Design a protein with these regions (language model features):
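Glycine-biased, small-residue-rich flexible motifs in mid-sequence functional cores and linkers
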Residues: 1-189
Length: 189
């Protein structure tokens, strides 16, 4: 969600920070948007994790504009990248954000949805990831919080596993030191 709650921000930060403690460093992929996306990217950089920002514009246009300095920092950081499926001069149109989500879902072995409204872009990304036979996790939230309704629905529909602790996520991904025998899939980009 672009309108991340304090609960969502706390769990996004905890989750990405915990991933940084793993022996095998995962790649954090998100869309450079307000809220959860930028929280994940910033926490990844602060924690020494590689991160990729998938753009819904041409490569020279950072949207939202206020993330331009951060995008430049990300781009200059070894192991990090900005990628776009669009040619230079492409404006930030609504349809482009939906198409960007298919790239995010395709790059990632696992999708973690921190918060989403029922019709949020994260819902589309999560459903695409599920349709690609990827693992999907969603942070359960209060039933009366619009920002948690999407996550709660994905859990109810069994599209996503509930993210109930960072330790469980690390175990599930085979990144926890307590897990000794688990194949970890990685992608080279």
């Amino acid at each position: 969600t672009r309108d991340i709650s304090p609960y969502g921000k706390e769990w996004c930060t905890k989750t990405v920070s915990a991933l940084a403690s793993a022996q095998e460093k995962p790649l954090i992929v998100s869309g450079l948007a307000l809220g959860t996306d930028i929280c994940a990217h910033k926490t990844a950089l602060e924690s020494g994790l590689p991160t990729i920002g998938v753009m819904a514009t041409g490569p020279e246009t950072v949207y939202p504009f206020r993330h331009r300095d951060f995008a430049e920092r990300l781009w200059r950081t070894p192991g990090c990248a900005l990628i776009s499926d669009y040619p230079p001069g492409t404006a930030p149109l609504a349809l482009h954000f939906l198409r960007r989500n298919r790239i995010i879902a395709g790059i990632c072995d696992t999708t973690v949805l921190i918060e989403s409204k029922i019709k949020g872009g994260g819902m589309m990304t999560s459903r695409l990831a599920f349709s690609y036979s990827r693992d999907v996790y969603a942070l359960p939230g209060r039933i009366d919080d619009i920002r948690s309704q999407g996550c709660n629905r994905l859990i109810r529909e069994k599209v996503a596993e509930p993210l109930t602790s960072v330790e469980d996520l690390l175990d599930s991904l085979g990144l926890n030191s307590r897990v000794t025998a688990r194949k970890i899939c990685t992608r080279d980009i």
